[in-house]
Amino acid sequence: SICQVINLLNQPYVEGSRVRMMPDIHAGAGCTIGTTMTIKDKICPNLVGVDIGCGMETIRIKESHIEPQKLDKVIRNGIPSGFEIRQSSGRHRFYKDIDLSELHCANKVDVERGYSSVGTLGGGNHFIEANKDDEGNIYIVVHSGSRHLGLEIANFYQDAAYKSLTTYSKDEIDAIIAELKSSGREKEIQSILKTIKMKNSPVPKQLAYVAGELFEQYLHDMRIAQRFADLNRKAMMDVIVKGMGFHIEERFTTIHNYIDVDNMILRKGSVSAQDGEVLLIPINMRDGSLICVGKGNEDWNFSAPHGAGRLMSRSAACLLYTSPSPRDAHES
């Protein structure tokens, strides 16, 4: 984590940014999870990551009792998980609320797969859970993001970022040609142009950044992915609420992989904590989640941690530790 933080702080596009690391910081792919920073006119797509808009949808229901077996059945029968998506004939109706053809990179992503992914959980650390607070109120939480669509968008713009830094622009090529002509070296133009197809990138590929028009296009497409992730979670919650006959008394959303465009703040594994804002911080299956209220601390980019953090990957933990049964873990 320390090496990744140092590497990030040494990048040219971070100069002048207010960078803050959350208490749950841990190493990620390319950068640390638990990062928040202010941005201006450049950004590395990898800092947001591949699960654009990932977060939690939380509802508090009127009911004081639920049937766990029925809830489990509703979820398993109505919400695809893992690599599964919906059939085109069985898409959730919320897919009509977003137009993926508006993406600048629409021809580089699987739009139809995206529509069929609305209302699907995915894998990894994504989850659906029921919680009860100290006053007996019951909450349902859905944690998921933009699914494969977010991955495709992130990979496209990260590749485009690196290409933009290693490929000479038309203006640069024209300047080289003009210099050769002014030096009387017109005959060398074609041979020299063949040797300068690539230039050295000022940053590593995984930390390459978008700027100018590419920056604006990324922000545009990222916002669409964030909207997609929000609809995805709400679609799953819709399945649960209708299947269980729940009555919603309160709901709120907590996002942790995105750029707050209104305030130009990037949050990677951190969440918005504006003054008075209600947010959710999940800990683990045994200890549940924390319902918190933001303090609006500007020095910390109006942000809070998105979880408890971890010392190793899930796969490494499975190899080193024997998990107790869910009942034993919850009762410990």
Language-model regions, residue ranges each:
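N- or domain-start disorder-to-order transition segments that initiate the globular core
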Residues: 1-15, 118-120
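Conserved phosphate/anionic-ligand binding catalytic regions in large, soluble enzymes, centered on
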Residues: 24-35, 44-56, 138-153, 300-314
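Accessory "access/gating" subregions that flank catalytic or transport cores
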Residues: 97-98, 102-132, 203-295
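Conserved small/polar residues in nucleotide/adenosyl-binding loops
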Residues: 321-326
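A generic, well-ordered mixed alpha/beta core segment in the N-terminal half of proteins
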Residues: 46-90, 100
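Short beta-strand elements
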Residues: 34-39, 45-48, 126-132, 291-296, ...
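Hydrophobic alpha-helical bundle architecture
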Residues: 282-304, 311-319
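A conserved active-site cap/scaffold subdomain adjacent to cofactor or substrate pockets
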Residues: 148-154, 158, 164-247
